Amino acid sequence: MKTLVTAVLFLCSACVLAAGNGVKVPPFERLQLPNGTVVLLMERHDVPLIAFSAVLRGGAVSDPAGGSGVASLLAGLLQKGAGQRDAVQFAETVASVGGQIEAAASTESISVSGSFLARDQQLMVELVADMLQRPRLEQEQFDTLRARQIEFIRAAKESDLAALAPIYGESHLFGAHPYGRPVDGSEASLAAIKHADLQRYYQEQVGADRLIISVAGDFKSAQLQQRISSAFSGWRKAGTPLQQLPQAERVASRNVLLIDAPESVQSYFWAGNVAVAKKDPRRPSLDVTNTLFGGRFTSMLNTELRIRTGLSYNASSHFDRLQQPGNWEMSSFTQTETTIQALDLMLATLDQLHESGLEPALVESGKSYVQGQYPLALETSEQWAAQLATLEFYGLDRRYIDDYSAQLGGVTSADAKKVIDEVIPPSTALSIVVIGNAAAIRDGLRKYGPITEMKLADPTFAPVRAE
């Protein structure tokens, strides 16, 4: 095996402890192939299943300028024929053994994940290797998928404006920074993408040195190492180096993007700013604080906008933590006639958080909630395969999981106030996006800051710049 892999083999110990002691990372092995591919293997023999997560660094941030959606299209095409199998044969092969495979793009990666019976591990490795190394990327399949993706966006503009608000929001907040690119593209950017653009992306942005393969389940590590090494050690590296991204700048004042949806009887609003990266050490305090402000049903935001006033059916906030600082955002929706009232209340609730902080009893409640939810995300082989890939992707070690419960237990009201002051933006420094009937709400929105307008019918998610 030493001739096949670099001698970077880690045997990690400990197991999942009782809930009161928190979650610990079970034993797993890490190895790196000579071409740069990282392989993570965690044996779990509770059920005869194997789950995998194969992650390629890159994603939407590596889309060409003006070509947002290329990574997403590539992810969609990985299952539409690979190796000796066309799209139908590939799907039938997976289904015939009761397996599951799906591919998706995100801001910073393209991932392929799935699960198979333990007896089918050789087929699993073969299919994943074909998808990544030998995708067919046929013109006809490309044309069909691109047209379908454009239709999905148009359908969302007719029936799911809530799903579009954060896309407009992040595009508005990050501007020309790659984090502002819509992962699935826009009507305009998708229409401009050619088949050759997708092939070029595959050659330049996909390769062994970008790949993390994480597997958890019922297998013998030595045997699976050999199979993965045989299937992937000969793969080429990506044609270009991985782009190193700069930090995005926080907005220092308020500004508004108004998207005119004249037929809508509701307004959908989003507000956010640049916040923290995945590796930020204040994670426990941030998680507790956000949970209490907008991360659970009884949060401050939802209590004010739904439970107490009935202005909305839902109001929430969350962090998007990436390699570089991503965004913190809050969002909700309401009837057109109560748009300004609801937005005022959302901003006032944020002011309350900054002015009063969080009382110790409330912090204890938030800690208990997060402590109870966290283990539920680390129970199955599918979850562990994904989690190991995430740790590797962001350069995090096992302490990110092992120490989390104890760190949560130590969060105080003072810690919460510190991250509120340092990370959560004040109501005076927000990018605000509102989708709604502009004629009915434009004048009321003027008090929040300078307004930039566009139409829902516009084929982009930004008013001027190329996506």
PLM-predicted stretches and their roles:
Residues 22-55:
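Mature N-terminal segment immediately following signal peptide/propeptide cleavage
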Residues 29-30, 38-43, 199-204, 253-261, ...:
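Short, surface-exposed beta-strand/loop micro-motifs that present aromatic residues
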Residues 13-14:
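N-terminal signal peptide c-region/cleavage motif recognized by signal peptidases
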Residues 21, 175, 212-277, 434-467:
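An aromatic/glycine/proline-enriched structural segment found at the starts
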Residues 134-142, 193:
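Peptidyl-prolyl cis-trans isomerase
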